[in-house]
Amino acid sequence: MSTLNNLTKTLTQQVDDGPISAVRLVKGYDNSYALNAAGQVTALSIGNSSLKKLVLGTEAQALEYLYLSGSESLKEVVFEVPLPHLTHLYLNNCAIKDITIPKGFRSLQQVYLQKNGLTELVFEGDCPALVLLDVSENQLKGLSFHSGFRALKYIYATNNVLQKITFNRSMRLLNTLHLAKNQLTELAPFLSEIETMETLYLQGNQLLRIDREIWDRDLNCWDTMKGYLTSLNKGNIIREYLHEAKMILIGNGEVGKTSIRLKLLDINAPLPDKKDRTPGLDIVPYTIANLSSAQTGLPASTSFTFNIWDFGGQGKYREIQQLFCSRKSLYLYVTAYDDTADYNELYVGYEYWLAMANAYNNDSGQHSPVIYVQNKNDMGEKPINEEEVKHKFGNVGAFIKISCVDKEQFTALPKLIVKSISKISEDIFTVQYNSEWLGVKEDLNELKNQGTNYISKEEFITICTERGLSEDEIRAWLTVLDRIGAVIYFGDNEKLKDWIVLNPIWVKDAICKVIDFEFYDDIATLKPSFLPKIWEEYSESEREKLLQLLISYHFCYKEEESFIVPALFTENQPKYPEHLSSFDCEIKLKYVSFLPAGTLHKFMVKLHDKIYNELRWKKGVVLQDGATNTYAEVTERWKEHSIYIRLKDKKGQHPLWQEIQKTLQELNEELKTTKLMQLDFEVYCFYNNKWKAKPDIEDLCELDSTNIFKFMFGLSSPVKEYISQKPTPLLGKAKLSIIFLTADPENKNPIGASVQKQRIENTISDAFEFYNNLETKYNEIGSNTVGKDIVHITVHGIPDQLFFVHDKHTDQSNPVQSDYLCKQLEKTKQVKKLIVLIACNSETTAKKIVDGGLTKYAIGTTIDISSKAAIDFSEKFYDLLKNSPLQIESVFEETCYELNQDKYRAKLDDGEFYDYSKVFKIFKKTT
């Protein structure tokens, strides 16, 4: 057990030489303390200590600042008396399981208790000055705040097991609540009354009565949640269930999707003729009545309504279909015995359709459920390898063979649909809304059924106001209606934000009319004079809106006075000029899940100003960067789920590559945001007549400086020469300085040094002063680091030794013992803020440097590391450090955490992923 008096005997007293408070003086200095004029301890900093228990008695009553962060063995902190002057309490990253804050902490402003494994936190009295509380990443089951927390603004409680959190209505200054990844089932409605609230994180909870579209769609869900909570604050509120979802029929043309839709609605309905094929999309409601309590978990029987979205299977409409797919849907993939390439030239395999459904996550982060339906069973069967399908697509929940002409056989399908409802979403039967909100939805449905295709936002507001919705509720409900597909709203589009579409079929029909229109040229030029012919039953104002809608969907782009529609380009590839008869290199982007139909067409729209000499066709385009006179050919191989890129640049820098990659990533992000689709692609390079993954190419570039793909890793930029500088005084310096040292000037050993240097320099931009020496000799280490705050060393290493260059014209290098390195650093007569040793097995050296008092922090490695691991760590670490240059420990932890989440992170020789928190180790000065 330790007490304050015992601790200060071994610590350094910080002296106040000016108008700086004791708290500010000690803050940031470990193993130190400060006294007031009466000789009482006012500030104490002993982070990363070996304390097990700390008891604070009367000798601590003057404490204003207490820092014990990172004391991993500290299990107990006992306050024997109130600490009325304490303002800051840092107890994060310790081993405290429970803690009690007694009465009398009236000055306490900030409390940090994250990452302790804390199971109980008790405030026995008021904390009227408390502004911030961080209890993230613990094991707390509940939090309760009474009227003594009126100043509290920021609560961080992510990653606990919170089942309940209660607030007092007097807490009117709340601004930020981070409550993600808990087990909350409800939230106090009165929060909507707090005018200062701005941020609310709720992802990963269990608020099953509130639609996840409200609280789990955005990282900060306050805007929509505020409106919902406002609706609950009203007197005599009636909550009603919204038992509704989409059923989306997908598959190739002529497999019987429309027949299935008709038979679900009426088992006796006649089958449609071939001429009645669905043009793009049809939508009809399908209600299942009298679902039992056993099926729903509700106290009484209820009905459930599917809106059946019947997608036409014709290839030309696939680009439209994705506009209307969504999560919280049940997918029916329909095939048949004659659904093969032999019968249908536009046939695509089940992999495309199931990958499309698989890309849409449902509310729990799981993939949307799919029923695999083989139709026309009376006419023949096609063998299905169910095990293979399930292995590729785990969201296929059931397989069924039916015939639409055999009533008895068909009835098995609706029974299977009922069983699948609960798989759509965990809250599918529990979500409730204010009856006023659902009343608005009913009003909109009635308008649609009466033939109204759209209304103005002003009309929508009037309908909501008449139903009693407030301004916050109106904003939230419109967002939700758009997300669940009840309306289409382009709130971010200046020309469409006052327009709300009630009938998606009307939009679909308008787009289909463009697709079906016979243009007079191969470029599919949509001239203004064509619009009255294409949309003859639409008014002029409607045509203007629809044209803007096509632009918003990246369906067309403007060229002079006309609009170009890439989806309608000819299949014929144009002839290239002589200077494009060959290209320098080829890259493939392989989409991990699937390549959405129309991706290349949207890509052309976004980069249309770079299209070269009208070299554009249905499956490809040639781009030019005018400033550098460089070229890129981009083509789509849809069935391979791949985009192919060929580049041409005499200088080998290929500036178009970054723009192409960035644009395709932006298109992915748009779908991730609007549709919650999980889209990513892997990069491959064609090297020595083989396709190689990008990480493998990066290693090859390290070995071969002439590799044509070095531009992908920033290796084509000129190297900034190291300039020896005189020692720079630290006081008053605006920026921290970094010196990058390596010992491989001829790049003879693949340690990733040049890439590290380039990545670090690009990452930090002008946030730090950056210097480098790429041929550091063993006896120049000290002189190179004079006046530098951060020293980054990238060399080869073995335990207790690093290797620095001896002669840059040979392979010779000198082994430098840890003790010698320490002596070199001692010459600077300066304690560094940080030394980073990116070398194999460098932890021993890092520890010796810290133990020698030469730096406050040092980072080393525990094993042999690959160049990829070294590069990734360096880039991520400095990217985070530039925003928090004084929080080195936290930045290190966050770096390791984020890298461990990367599914493309480096692998060990045995194929296992790196655990960066074990491979890299940080040491901190403690004496």
Swiss-Prot record:
Residue spans of the LRR repeats: 38-61, 83-107, 109-125, 127-151, 171-194, 195-217
Keywords of the record:
Antiviral defense, Hydrolase, Leucine-rich repeat, Protease, Repeat, Serine protease
Q: Which Gene3D superfamilies match?
A: 3.30.310.200, P-loop containing nucleotide triphosphate hydrolases, Ribonuclease Inhibitor, Winged helix-like DNA-binding domain superfamily/Winged helix DNA-binding domain
Decide whether keyword Protease is in the record: yes
- Spell out the coiled coil positions from the record: none
A single GO molecular function term of this UniProt record: serine-type peptidase activity
Region listing for LRR 5, in residue ranges: 152-170
pH behavior: Optimum pH is 8.4 to 10.2.
The record places the active site at 796, 840
Occurrences of domain COR (ranges): 436-623
What EC number(s) are associated with this protein in UniProt?
Answer: 3.4.21.-
Top EC class, one word: hydrolase
GO BP, sorted A to Z: defense response to virus; proteolysis
The answer to whether UniProt assigns keyword Lipid metabolism to this entry is no
Question: Which Pfam families does the entry link to?
Answer: COR-A, COR-B, Roc
Q: What does this protein do?
A: A dedicated protease for gasdermin bGSDM; cleaves the bGSDM precursor, releasing the pore-forming moiety, which integrates into the membrane and triggers cell death. Probably involved in defense against bacteriophages. Expression of bGSDM and this neighboring protease is highly toxic in E.coli. Cells expressing the gene pair stop dividing and lose membrane integrity. Both proteins are required to kill E.coli.
PANTHER family xref list? IG(IMMUNOGLOBULIN) AND LRR(LEUCINE RICH REPEAT) DOMAINS (PTHR24366), LEUCINE RICH REPEAT CONTAINING 53 (PTHR24366:SF96)
Q: What is the recorded name of this protein?
A: Roc-COR-CHAT protease
Q: Which organism is it from?
A: Runella zeae (strain ATCC BAA-293 / DSM 19591 / LMG 21438 / NS12)
